[in-house]
Amino acid sequence: MAGQQGIYCAPDNIVPNRDRVDVGCAPDGAMQLWVMEYEVTGIGKGCAMCKAINPQQAEMLLKSNGIYNGSSYLYKVTRIEQVIVPPCNGLMAEQVVTYKDVVS
């Protein structure tokens, strides 16, 4: 079995892959959650979450439905990770932008 891939959100006492089988990105066409980090040429950076069958479709959906969908060539996706949904409740994501990172 391959090593853990994707973002696994769970408490420390939950073992990754305990409740799932390693069957690839989307068995039988099931949709998965994907988180993407990207750059928008000349504008900045961003992140997005998408529900899609595979990472290629997630990227396509970002470019066709994102804020800059009229200029999809501006998007440069730098990272795509599958979100592994935990069997229990928990924090899924958090992002902090510090004041020194914000350009006035």
From Swiss-Prot:
The keyword Disulfide bond applies. It is found in: Virion. This is Portal vertex auxiliary protein. Disulfide bonds join C25-C88. It comes from Bacteroides phage crAss001. GO terms for cellular component: virion component. Keywords: Disulfide bond, Virion. It comes from the Viruses. Homodimer; disulfide-linked. Interacts with the major capsid protein.
